[in-house]
Amino acid sequence: MSVKASTAAELFMKAADVHGTRVAFGTRLKSRLWKPTNFAELYEEGACLATALIDMGLERGEHVGLLADNRIEWIISNCGIQLAGAADVPRGTDVTDADITYILPHADVRICFIENVELWKRIQVLKSELKGIETYILMNLDQSAPEGVLHLKDLIEKGRALRKDGDRRAEERAKAVQPEDLSTIIYTSGTTGSPKGVMLQHSNIMYMIDCIPVDLGPHDRALSILPVWHIFERALEMFSIAMGCSTYYSSIRMLGDDLKNVQPTFMGSAPRLWEVLYMRILDNAQAAHPVRRFLFHTGYGLAEIYKNSLFYLKNRTPHLHKPNPILFSLGWILHLVRWILVTPLYGFFNVAVLERIRQAAGASLKATISGGGALPRHVDQFFNYVGIPVLEGYGMTETAGPITARTLNRLVIETVGPVLEGVEVKIVDLNHGEILYPNPKNKHMGKGLRGEIHVKGPIVMRGYYKNQEATDKVMKDGWMNTGDIGMMTFNDCLKILGRSKDTIVLASGENVEPVPIENRLLQSPLIDHVMVVGQDEKNLGALIVPSIEGFQALGFESMGVAELADHPDVEKRVAAAIKQEISAENGFKSFERVTDFRLLPQT
């Protein structure tokens, strides 16, 4: 039974009642030994903390700093802050000194949770710039609090004693929280200036967790590996709480072991994780006995044919242009015949070969939602073809997480899936500002037309904290300009093409989106990093870092990046790879061709 709530505080309270003694979170004690915390314990610890915070003078609506990584103390602290009617201002322990001294004062933080003593030592050096902070609370239960710092466990015990005497201020505060109240202020990275504080209401986050397209229940297990202060991972953890799912705090280093011993049925993930796993699988296959290598390539080749035809039959291939009914029907028949013919062989190799890949990459996974960046096409295809459903989503901090997401029934590779229920998306012309999609004046309502993505709905932020100018730049009449370029496909899925600010305008006046070109070039095993350039030039160029692993496979042994960049044969092979990838056959126009490039000796 899932929990429906209008605020995070209500969610914690109801989850304790509904899910009770079921495991809410698992914390690693040893390699395969986990300490469980059930839903009732999570709420009670949070309520004790909230009581102590209120007793200290924490006001409703106040902003509380929360500098920590994924750990049980994070969710307990967050629970306490939410129950007390306050809003958290989270960041990881890798936060820079510059961000600490900007974010905490800007957010008007008076009380700040810190994960460990090491972070406290950094803060001591910066204290002259953090004069508004009156109280620091150490979270790590294995460390003693330095002088002048409170300890989380002491506050919980203080709150426990107060509650034992009948103190119920935590419940009173929690019930007073309204959906339109602030739940969190998340500061986005300030790559072009100071970080901006995204104000998210309880209603934003609660609506989001109702839209996550995965069916979970009390018997499901999730791994937490993405930074919990990011809205994507945070929304997934709140979703798990609502569903009664058990969440285990893992890490990239322990992921391989945890996929086997926890056997998760769900997890949030990032493209880089799948890229690393993809390369590891390919490296293992390449190093295997020739017979095993043959079986691997044969098995995957059959899976590619089988799934490619199956996706065509189920309308799961991205239609960027309106399909010709006759050609589509003919293709449907041909794919049906091919699918029938390959099924027996695929069935054998699926059990004998592909099952081993699934076991290594998480055979128990019902699905994983990948966010935070675009999945490379070849990686996307590989895992979905071998039978690991990767549901790519698209969103941002300003929208409390996903705007769109694939579902198991709408798993269209190379897209980020359909728009979430209750959310509106429009595609806007970059030059004239006219609505391209949905527009009844345009052919097919504007499907297949490229433009800037704007979004509206209950997931959109209130604005940037104390920064009306930045808010006005991206918000107009409830619509938020994402700054991303995309199109709606003819099977009603969104396809991301790049960033509007990344658009290159050639001397001819042609607008070029570099991201699709860069993503295609990265599919070559010879290219490790690439940046397409060419603003105001006649043609496009590229800055390329050659791949050590890719060239080692071709016999360029014991050579570093600098040596590869100076090697004439490397230059010839990269030129051939560029010509092969950026071609008309792969859907690129003549002005999108890369006519010049430079090999860089380092990243």
Language model region names:
Residues 21, 25-79, 96-101, 151-156, ...:
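Conserved AMP-binding/adenylate-forming core of the ANL superfamily
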Residues 21-23, 160-187, 194, 216-221:
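Conserved pre-ATP/AMP-binding loop-to-beta segment of ANL
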Residues 36-40, 183-209:
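Conserved AMP-binding A3 loop
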Residues 79, 83-158, 172, 576:
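Structural core segment of the AMP-binding/adenylate-forming
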Residues 188, 434-436, 441-506:
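Conserved ATP-binding/catalytic segment of the ANL
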Residues 206-224, 228-329, 333-354, 364:
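Conserved AMP-binding/adenylation subdomain of ANL enzymes
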Residues 248, 340-347, 354, 358-370, ...:
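Conserved ATP-binding loop and adjacent catalytic segment of the adenylate-forming AMP-binding
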Residues 504, 529-533, 538, 579-603:
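Conserved C-terminal "lid"/linker of ANL adenylate-forming enzymes
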